[in-house]
Amino acid sequence: MNSKQHCNRCGKQVYPTDKVGPLKDSTFFHQGCFKCYICGTRLALKTYCNNRNDINDKEVYCSNHVPIAGPHDLPMASTNGSGKNLENNNHVKNGNWIDAGLSDMKIAHAMKATQVARPYPKISHEGAKYVVDYDTQTRLELLHRKDEDDLYESFQDKRVREAEEFEKENTEEWEKALAEFAKKYEKGQSNMKKDDLIRQLTIKREKKLETLHTKRKERERHQTAELVDRQAKEMLELFKASRSEYSNLQYPSTPPPPVPPSCSKREIYTTTDYFSSIDEVAIHCARNEVASFTDLIRTLSSGARSDVDVARAIYRWITIKNLNTMIFDDSIQNDTPMGLLRGIKYGTESYHVLFKRLCSYAGLHCVVIKGFSKSAGYQPGYSFDDHRFRNTWNAVFLDGSWRFVQCNWGARHLVNAKDGSHEAKTDGNLRYEYDDHYFMTDSEEFIYEFFPSDHAWQLLPRPLSLLQFERIPFVRSLFFKYNLSFIDNKLESTVYTDKSGAASISIRLPPKGDSLIFHYNLKFFDSEENTISGMSLKRFVMQSVTEDVVTFRVHAPSTRPLLLDIFANSVSSGAYLTGQPIKFKSVCKFKVVCESLQVIMVPLPECASGEWGPAKATRLFGLLPISHPDAIINTGRYVEIRFRMTRPLSEFVASLHRNRTDDRALQACTRSALKGDMVYIQIEFPGEGQYGLDIYTRQDDQLINGKQLLTHCCKYLIHSRNC
C-alpha cells in the first residue's frame, strides 16, 4: 500500500512539516499551495471554501471566488411539469398575486448560478516547489550528520586529552616552584611569601588556560567551517543535478563570480511588510522545533515566492533564535531539534556558518567572507594593523546578484524605549526584534562597516583600499535607515579644526525627515572625561538645523583630541509633546583634532540640550518664525521675537541664560504674550554679551500624571551689543 500523500494542487508529495489536511474531501495541500484556486489568496483551515455545486471539484477557494450559488439564486422547480403548477408557483402564493417581474429575476439568477458553477480558468501557480526530492535530501543529511558526529567526538576526545595534559604540566610546574621555594625558605634566601607565590602561579595558570581555550576554539571553528563548506558543496551538487531536469529554472547551477549587484536593495523591496507572511512562518517555525535541516528549510520556504524570500526566512529564523543565550542540556541527543544546533553549544559554529549551511539546504549559493569590521570597541581614526576587529559575514546569490548578509549584527540589535513603534519581545530563547539593514545590505553602505580581505568581495565598481576604509566616516546602520547623507563627500572619520579650533559636520536630511531629532555627546578621545575646567564639553558644540541640513559646529577648548558622537531618533510631534524621555541611538562618530589653538574658546550659555534655532519649533510645534528664522540673533539692548501658531498652544515661557550670571537675575528680562495666532517674546538685556534663550510651551489638553507641564520648544543664541 502506498502511504505517500500528494498535494492536490501541484501533485507532488507532501510531508508533515508543510502539510495541510486532510480536508473534508480527504485531500492534502502544501502550505504554499493552499491558496485560492482563482486569485491565489493564502487560505487557512477556517477560511477555505469548497465548490458545493460539483463534488468532483477538489480545489479550494476564498469566500469571494467560491463557485456556489445561494438558495435564493436557484429557480423554483415545477412539481409535475404542468403549466398550471408553474403558473401557480410563479404568480399566486397563498391566494396572493406575485409580481411577474420576480419570475424574470429568478431566470436571471438561474443563469448567473449556471455561470458560477462553470469551472474558472485555472490560475498559474507554482506551488511549493522543492527541486530536490525529500528522501534524497534526508539521506544526504544523515550522512552529513554522521560526519559531524565523528568530528564532535574527536573534539571531545582531544579536549579531554588536552585537559589531562594541562593539569599534568600545571601540577609539575607547581610542585617544582613550591619545592624551590621551600629550599630557599630554609636557607633564608626567599624574598617572597608563600601566598604571593601561589597567587602568582594561579594567575599564570589562568592565562595559560585562557590561551589554550582560545587556540582550541579557533582550531575547532576552523575545522567545523571546513566541514560545513564541504557538506554545502555536496548539497549544492544535489541541487545542481536536480535543476538540470528543470529547463525553466533560472537560478545558476554554479556560483557566479563576485561582481557589483545589478540593482539596489530598495529596488527589490522598500518595506519589511513585503515579507510579513515569510516572517510569520519563521516566527512560527522558531517556536516549534524540527528535527532535521531538511524539514526546517521546507517549512521556512513553504510560502516563498522567490530565492529572496527563502534567504529572508533563513535570516529571520536565525535572528529570532537567540543563539547566544541558548542553554543546552549535557544529555542532548544529536538527532533532536536542539541537537541540530550543537555547534552553537560547542562554540564551533557561528551565525555565518549556520547561515551558509541552511542556504545550501535551500539550494542557494552562499560564501563566508573574512575581513575587518568597525565593531564594538572601534573608534574613528583607529588603524587595522593587527588581529583586532577581525570579523566574518556572508554573501548569498539572490535576485541575480550577490547580496551581503550579517546575521550576527542583525540579531544583536538593541532596542531603546522610543526606538520605532514597537519594543523588543522575547520568549525564552526567541527574540522578535532585529535589524533589517544587515539583510541584503547594499555594497555602497556595507563598505562603511566591513572590509573583506579579498577586495573583489567589496562588490564595488571601484574597491577601496584599507587606508580609505579607515578614513571614511564611522557610521552605523541607523544612518542608512534614516536615509541620511553627508554634505561633504570628502568628509573623513577624523576632522581637523581651523586655527580658531572650529570644525563643522553637516548631515543632509531626507525629504520626509521632519520627525528626526538629533543629539550629540562630546568627550575627550583618550578617556571618558566630558568636562574641562568644570564645564561640560557639550557647551562647545552648536547644533542647528536649516532647511534640510543639520550641522554640528565644534569649537575645541584645547588641543586634546575629542570624540563627537551624533545620535538620532524618529519621534512624532505628539510623542515629543508628552515630555517623556527620548532614547537616542548613535548614527555616526568623529574624531576631532585641533593641532594648534590661537583663540581662547568661550562655552555656549548653559541652555537645554539639543539644537539651536526655530526649526524644531516648526517641525514639532507648528510654530512659524516671523521675525528671526536663524539660530543666531545679533541685536542691541531690546529684541522682540515673533512666531505664528498653526495649531493652538496655550502658554509660552522664556528663560534667559548667560555665562557667570545667575538665571534668577535674568528672570525679569523676558516677557511673553499671545495675541490671536501670534506669539511675542520680548527681551531687554541688562548688558552686552552672549545670551542663550530657551522657549517652552504646552497644549491645553497636555497632561502628564495629571499635571500640565511645559515642553522645550526651541532656543536662540543672542549677541547683544551697544547696551
UniProtKB/Swiss-Prot annotation:
Location of the LIM zinc-binding domain = 5-72
Localization, UniProt: Cytoplasm, Cytoskeleton
Keywords annotated in UniProt:
Cytoplasm, Cytoskeleton, LIM domain, Metal-binding, Zinc
Question: Out of the domains of life, which is the source?
Answer: Eukaryota
Gene Ontology process terms (BP): muscle structure development
Q: Does the keyword Transferase apply?
A: no
Q: Does the keyword DNA-binding apply?
A: no
Summary of the tissues where the protein is detected: Expressed in the Y and U rectal epithelial cells, in marginal cells of the terminal bulb and isthmus of the pharynx (at protein level).
Provide one Gene Ontology cellular component.
Answer: cell-cell junction
An MF annotation (GO) of this entry: metal ion binding
The UniProt function text for this chain reads: Cytoskeleton-associated protein. May play a role in hypodermal cell development.
Q: What family does the database annotate? A: Belongs to the transglutaminase-like superfamily.
Protein name per its UniProtKB record: Lim and transglutaminase domain protein ltd-1
